[in-house]
Amino acid sequence: MEASSSGTAELPRSLSRRAPSRATTMMIDRPNEDASAMDSELVPSSLASIAPILRVANEIEKDNPRVAYLCRFHAFEKAHRMDATSSGRGVRQFKTYLLHRLEKEEEETKPQLAKNDPREIQAYYQNFYEKYIKEGETSRKPEEMARLYQIASVLYDVLKTVVPSPKVDYETRRYAEEVERKRDRYEHYNILPLYAVGTKPAIVELPEVKAAFSAVRNVRNLPRRRIHLPSNTPNEMRKARTKLNDILEWLASEFGFQRGNVANQREHIILLLANADIRKRNDEEYDELKPSTVTELMDKTFKSYYSWCKYLHSTSNLKFPDDCDKQQLQLIYISLYLLIWGEASNVRFMPECICYIFHNMANDVYGILFSNVEAVSGETYETEEVIDEESFLRTVITPIYQVIRNEAKRNKGGTASHSQWRNYDDLNEYFWSKKCFKIGWPLDLKADFFLNSDEITPQDERLNQVTYGKSKPKTNFVEVRTFWNLFRDFDRMWIFLVMAFQAMVIVGWHGSGSLGDIFDKDVFKTVLTIFITSAYLTLLQAALDIILNFNAWKNFKFSQILRYLLKFAVAFMWAVLLPIAYSKSVQRPTGVVKFFSTWTGDWKDQSFYTYAVSFYVLPNILAALLFLVPPFRRAMECSDMRPIKVIMWWAQPKLYVGRGMHEDMFSLFKYTTFWIMLLISKLAFNYYVEILPLITPTKMIMNLHIGHYQWHEFFPHATNNIGVVIAIWAPIVLVYLMDTQIWYAIFSTLFGGIHGAFSHLGEIRTLGMLRSRFESIPIAFSRTLMPSEDAKRKHADDYVDQKNITNFSQVWNEFIYSMRSEDKISDRDRDLLLVPSSSGDVSVIQWPPFLLASKIPIAVDMAKDFKGKEDAELFRKIKSDSYMYYAVIESYETLKKIIYALLEDEADRRVMNQVFLEVDMSMQQQRFIYEFRMSGLPLLSDKLEKFLSILLSDYEDQGTYKSQLINVFQDVIEIITQDLLVNGHEILERARVHSPDIKNEKKEQRFEKINIHLVRDRCWREKVIRLHLLLSVKESAINVPQNLEARRRITFFANSLFMNMPSAPRIRDMLSFSVLTPYYKEDVLYSEEDLNKENEDGISILFYLQKIYPDEWTNYLDRLKDPKLPEKDKSEFLREWVSYRGQTLARTVRGMMYYRQALELQCYQEVAGEQAEFSVFRAMASNDENQKAFLERARALADLKFTYVVSCQVYGNQKKSGDIHNRSCYTNILQLMLKYPSLRVAYVDEREETADAKSPKVFYSVLLKGGDKFDEEIYRIKLPGPPAEIGEGKPENQNHAIIFTRGEALQTIDMNQDNYFEEAFKLRNVLEEFNKERVGRRKPTILGLREHIFTGSVSSLAWFMSNQESSFVTIGQRILANPLRVRFHYGHPDIFDRIFHITRGGVSKASKVINLSEDIFGGFNSTLRGGYVTHHEYIQVGKGRDVGLNPISIFEAKVANGNGEQTLSRDVYRLGHRFDFYRMLSFYFTTIGFYFSSMLTVLTVYAFLYGRMYMVMSGLEKEILRLASPNQLEALEQALATQSIFQLGFLMVLPMVMEIGLEHGFRSAIVDFFIMQLQLASVFFTFQLGTKSHYYGRTILHGGSKYRPTGRGFVVFHAKFAENYRLYSRSHFVKGLELLLLLVVYQIYGHSYRSSNLYLYITVSMWFMVGSWLFAPFIFNPSGFEWQKTVDDWTDWKRWLGDRGGIGIPVEKSWESWWNVEQEHLKHTSIRGRILEITLALRFFIYQYGIVYQLNISQRSKSFLVYGLSWVVLLTSLLVLKMVSMGRRRFGTDFQLMFRILKALLFLGFLSVMTILFVVFKLTLTDLSASVLAFLPTGWAILLIGQVLRSPIKALGVWDSVKELGRAYENIMGLVIFAPIAVLSWFPIVSEFQARLLFNQAFSRGLQISMILAGRKDKATSSHK
């Protein structure tokens, strides 16, 4: 038996021999898991088929242990047969574990039903069949029957191995045949159990589902394929060949689609048809689809295909002969497309490739159905081709997949140039030309498309394997890393800006400065030179198009090449012609007056230049005219007329995408007006503030003759002081190019604010506003959120009002209950906020008690103090407050009913009847104040309150309770009759006289018979609680609810009801939709260990949250007081409570499942109508058959309309993993599936399928749902290869799971999002936006939704980020959608038109690196393909954001990287060229333009400081200031002041202030603005400016973009100095120190005036930037200035800096490893990137060149020799340092004496040299300091150049020296940055101030942040669970 686990072929039938004494390894690290239950889940992937057997064994173990043992033995045998040598991963360990277990069970288990195993298993099988299957068919649900049939099938397989075939008795065999026959009907299903019998779920009984299923099952007259099968073919395959249930199975039999794919798409198409068919259809019963249903679905599905055929001038293969069954054929075509799409895997990203496949397969279908050979008769036809269920995958998808994968390998893990490999877009665009038909059908694998220029050999199969040889050319576009892309993509904008700048300079230069000077003939003539500039720029654009697309030329059509060459030739012609013409016109000047007056004269008299310009601008004039008529332009783009095609060919290259994107006239007018106003403001500001004031000083500088320089001037005779002019104008030009972004921020803020106000945003923003408008909320609710037939009713009668209240109360109460379950509100808040569900008992509307709180006590006091004589006056006072009036009437009527119900004695009731009659009569007759003593009311109120308190209290002794109740009630009666009623004794007497049994009346006390059992009745108890609240709540409920988040949600929900949203359709009419969430390895649910694990400060997550959310923690503890909850549940509740406050998958899933909860409530309201009982819905159960039917129907409709799929890509690996985190992720995801039965999980399953002694990996897309205890597999679809290795992770993850989504809409939700029940209720309204008629516009394809950032509650950083993000997702996207019309898709809660997008490439793009920001490309793609994106703010979805500086910076870096890659992409190029001019401006400034402007802001500072340094060091500044007035350079400072606005983050703050003002009031906005400034928001934004500019620039130059996972945890932890240094060294610290050096040099050597306020502002702003970049990470680092942590940080930093690196040493451990990683981008950059990097490094040599001439030792010499000698000194110093370093290495250990002698000699030499320099050459200490300033930058430049030239330097053998130089610089930089921190850490007040700064939000809420920071905690509190 030992051999069995090690590889022998034979397997013994008995386990009597001992197994090897190897320890079980399979169950290691599986805490809290039942081993017997889990073994089925730990099966190695290569043995996956035995998992069901082990599950069955576990299932039946309690029932019959012996049969369970036999099942396990069968599993072991099967495993051994599958992998006899145990070669698969984990197989040996698993078999060993199973063997041990079998040996143990063989001895422990004995047969129970018979004497031996064969009889035992037969008896058990028969019992199982009779007990569960036979009886269960009519009583059990399909999912239960599926499980039972699976068990029965497995049991029979086991039985056959135990019992020889002849000995299986007849009964067993008959049962097994019955199981086999019916098994297909009971397979695990997703939503529709289509073939189930017996008890069918309500969903399959819906008429629309029946009709759709019937249509799909119509296989009449479809020919059957007959194949000559080999004689040994199994019977199952033969049966499968002949049995066809529906159209999809017929297609599968013809083309070989997988079974899982067929089942998946069958349900998909049935649900699509059912949902479309029921819309606007009122029939309750029908069995046929509407003819229009299938036609409409077909039109939508094939709109893209028709477009593709038209573009390629190919005839569509969607053919319909006259005599065909059209609906059947339409369904065949739709099903075929969906089956192709469902199995296409990564090819789904190539929609036109799918069109090509469908085009050919549709032709095949037509051939099969309507060929001349075979009539459509339903007969079989013969064929030699054998089709199995993987034929389509093998012959069609896999070859294309291999091409994609081979190209992806060229990417070399994202390091190769984009031009070296073809991405998804390149391969897809191959199918945009007719040459795609050369691929042929069936696919010709020798076609050019499939042939790589170098075939990849099997040994090169690893993903990043380097491939050799030339790559194949790109298609249509080449992504090249260069900043020229910005000009190439947006050439019209840059040409406009350059021309405008030139025109303004000319006008300012030649005239008086007035814009009217342009009409002067000389000025106008010169202004016309802007067209020469335009011609040159156009030539540049034409050249760039040729150069940058060079790698795609081989794939270009001749017409494309011709166009590029002609464009270049024409541009070149104009670039030559216009300057020549202008030079001619100089001799014959022409003015504007003469020009216009002689226009009709002889052209020969006119300037040739004028005519040339006229012809030059003619195309632009035509384009402008077309721009004004968008429909005409759209028609031209889509036209097939040859003249128009020629014109459009010249205007823009013909492309499949980007046609007809022009907006309607009104939209055009709106965004054109926006931009014209903006550009006028910008240009006027530029002209009058920046350009015009600088003209005069420029002229003066150009006229100065400067002969004295302070350095060696290379061009001493250069005219006009051109260097100074460049130094002064460079910052001005940069600000001019950048400040449009500032004007955009201003205008978008204004327009966005106005648009938001007109959208009714923020009309209800406080609880006071809520109260004042609450009466109108139910009506608004009915109008917006109830189906339209109800909303149209006139609100005139009480019935309608009551109906409004009933519908509203159900939803409102569920909303309140959901907030209570989330612990947002307390029990008291809940009671005060609920609307009574039994509201028909009283004559007035019953409002929530929080509106009526304190109204009764106030009314009582008012009546007590009333001095008037008339009832009417008192009642008028009460009625003046409507809520008080409602409260008084309700209290009186409710009290009356409560008392009547309590009293059992008829006589007592008569007494009370007399009392109430007296009250009613006195009010009618207006003598109330005369009949009643008002002074007695307070006493009565108090006593009633006490009575109700006792009534509601819990009691143990019924007698005591009853006596207390009676006593207090008698007191109440006494007060009424004696203190309140003036004639109380008369009333009592009257009641006694009217008693029918007065003579027989017993001598007993009144009011002793009270029915105390009524309290158990829920509805009655609700009334008592409500009345008690009305009487007892003395204070105003103005602060109910207390929780800020609860307030925000209530006010937003109430406000949204008054906003413009579509009317709600009936549930059956609403669009069906899915939600898709991609998940990788993030936290699902925190474990108990996670909750209590303490960080270095002794803080656990639980403790932190207890302190941050104290009210929610208290509410949670109150909720746990329910004695029914077991302890186990309490610990689970604690984990959930913590997880729901983090950014976890559990939080996201809970939020998304609110959709289903809301749908079920809406369905229930509609189905049940007036019979709806809220208590039944809340319990989701009832004994009433009608109510049961209502609930079942509600669930069915919810299933029909909503699907939620979480794509857990690595769930399968997590399931098998031994890692604790992965394992917990698996168990938590499983728990989510079990908790939410409608949740579906998709994952990629990796299996090793053993064949020929190999275990190749096979990949599947699998869909799961929760079963009884474990997950249940629904669909399994084989993939052509690993799907996630080709593109970016997230879009690939979405793509593999998108096939399992359903419906017409798809919402993409990230796993850091949340949702709210009340918002989920609005979803059907939002989905109606897809059907909303829009004048002149297309229907939307993406609906953008508003987001609420839920992570801004504590630290200032979280608050800044939350506000910044909130402003972007509200006012930012509002303005993008309307008026600018450039909103795309930003990742999170957007809702896609699902069919539109699945037929056009999906919801995102996935090419490696270029599509790093994958989500926005989904929006680009949608827009380019004719989509239309909107934005809606009446609904919101929660979103988490990063809350610490480091995670925020990583996120910003990721986004900046993504924008860098976007700049290179074809999508941005196409949008930039296809949009009209103004929409293109919107597109630029709201996407990559923002990041380029950020970079320009930083470059402006550099340009200013380096320009000033040039002027200072050369001596030019000194000379200019001596000869000129200082006030003449103010324009430069004004321009830089503009730039600093951007730098300080005011651009971010403007939209924030506007949005906060809109939604919370402008007073709050202004206060928040000032608080943000006090909390150093400007430091934060300035710091982020550095992050954006660094990563954006580096990505364009060198690439190296990668997905950066960001922190989703809690923030309060201290980041070490070394960690901050690693993160910010290159992006901020180096640049900050460079600017510091520039400022210091300027301060030392500059001679500038210092009086100007603007100068001071600019200087301060630049110092501010330096300070922010160097110290922001430490200012925003918790405990950043605590002395002990500072000491620890220094120790850690020194250790990190000193440790040597090497292979496998992480960057956190060694500086050397980090240093190598930091240069990674330089290894893979292009030669262009290397040259640019070296060029940029040369700027550091300027310091040395400038400073050496300022030294005293130079003796004022201007000879170049001085600079040369300085290099000798520098190189000598470096050589000495190198000698010391080498000496330490060679002699330091073994020859210590030699090393000391060497050091002494060097020291003596140094002293000698210094002495000579001081004495002979007059060297000073100042010179020494200046030399440090000179040589430090030079050394850094050498280091930078050395890093770029790493390979040659390594070859020279001096790389170690470069490395040591690098380490020395890191030491210096670290010391400079660390020193101020160390000094400040000495002062404890600094640390306290920092804590206040960081956590002001928490302090203002009274939170114990100091305890969190200090790590002190109350153990009792934190351990309380």
From Swiss-Prot:
Coiled-coil residue windows:
none
Q: What is its EC number?
A: 2.4.1.34
Quote the InterPro entries the UniProt record gives.
Answer: FKS1-like_dom1, Glyco_trans_48_dom, Vta1/CALS_N, Vta1/CALS_N_sf
Q: For this UniProt entry, what's an example GO CC term?
A: 1,3-beta-D-glucan synthase complex
Q: Which reaction does it catalyse?
A: [(1->3)-beta-D-glucosyl](n) + UDP-alpha-D-glucose = [(1->3)-beta-D-glucosyl](n+1) + UDP + H(+)
Extracellular face of the membrane: 514-526, 582-611, 696-721, 1506-1540, 1586-1628, 1677-1730, 1781-1796, 1845-1867
Q: Which GO terms describe its biological process?
A: (1->3)-beta-D-glucan biosynthetic process; cell wall organization; regulation of cell shape
| Compartmental location | Cell membrane
Topological domain (Cytoplasmic) residues are 1-492, 548-560, 633-674, 743-1484, 1562-1564, 1650-1655, 1752-1759, 1818-1823, 1889-1921
Q: Which keywords does this chain's UniProt record carry? A: Cell membrane, Cell shape, Cell wall biogenesis/degradation, Glycosyltransferase, Membrane, Transferase, Transmembrane, Transmembrane helix
The residue range of the signal peptide is: none
Matching Gene3D superfamilies: Vacuolar protein sorting-associated protein vta1 (1.25.40.270)
The molecular function GO annotations come to:
1,3-beta-D-glucan synthase activity
How this chain sits in the membrane, per its record, is:
Multi-pass membrane protein
Record region (Disordered):
1-23
Q: Which residues cross the membrane?
A: 493-513, 527-547, 561-581, 612-632, 675-695, 722-742, 1485-1505, 1541-1561, 1565-1585, 1629-1649, 1656-1676, 1731-1751, 1760-1780, 1797-1817, 1824-1844, 1868-1888
Can you tell me which family this protein belongs to?
A: Belongs to the glycosyltransferase 48 family.
Q: Provide the function of this protein.
A: Probably involved in callose synthesis, but not required for callose formation after wounding or pathogen attack. During plant growth and development, callose is found as a transitory component of the cell plate in dividing cells, is a major component of pollen mother cell walls and pollen tubes, and is found as a structural component of plasmodesmatal canals.
- What is this protein called in UniProt? Putative callose synthase 6
State the species of origin: Arabidopsis thaliana (Mouse-ear cress)
